[in-house]
Curated annotation (Swiss-Prot):
UniProt family annotation: Belongs to the UPF0390 family.
One cellular-component annotation, GO: nucleus
Taxonomic path: Eukaryota, Fungi, Dikarya, Ascomycota, Taphrinomycotina
Organism of provenance: Schizosaccharomyces pombe (strain 972 / ATCC 24843) (Fission yeast)
Biased composition (Basic residues): 19-31
Pfam families recorded: DUF2462
Protein name: UPF0390 protein C24B10.18
Matches recorded under InterPro entries: UPF0390
Region described as Disordered: spans on this chain: 1-32
Top-level taxon: Eukaryota
Length: 93
């Protein structure tokens, strides 16, 4: 009885247009790597950047208030530190 060939597995999600990430260690035998499309990668980066920007703005006064209580940990402007400390005392965060 003749032995059949072992064909490489095709990634069904890649064939349907889905994105597949590269396995850094020990990929499955016959696994295929499909690079993400450039437009999708740029879109993801933009979304992540916008989220980070929003979080930074939201937490700026809180971080400054904590820093003003822990003298010497961070260098911040006096006005921003006082505003943050005031909000901490009032319990806005």
């Amino acid at each position: 009885m003749a032995q059949g060939e072992f064909k490489k597995k095709k990634n069904s999600s890649a064939n349907k247009g889905g994105r597949v990430t590269k396995h850094s260690k020990n990929p499955k035998k016959g696994a295929r790597y499909c690079a993400p499309r450039r437009a999708a990668a740029i879109k993801d980066h933009t979304i992540n950047a916008n989220i980070t920007k929003t979080l930074n703005v939201r937490n700026e006064k809180l971080i400054a208030g904590i820093a003003s209580q822990q003298v010497g940990k961070l260098t911040i402007t006096k006005a921003l530190g006082e505003a943050g400390a005031k909000e901490l005392k009032e319990g806005k965060h």
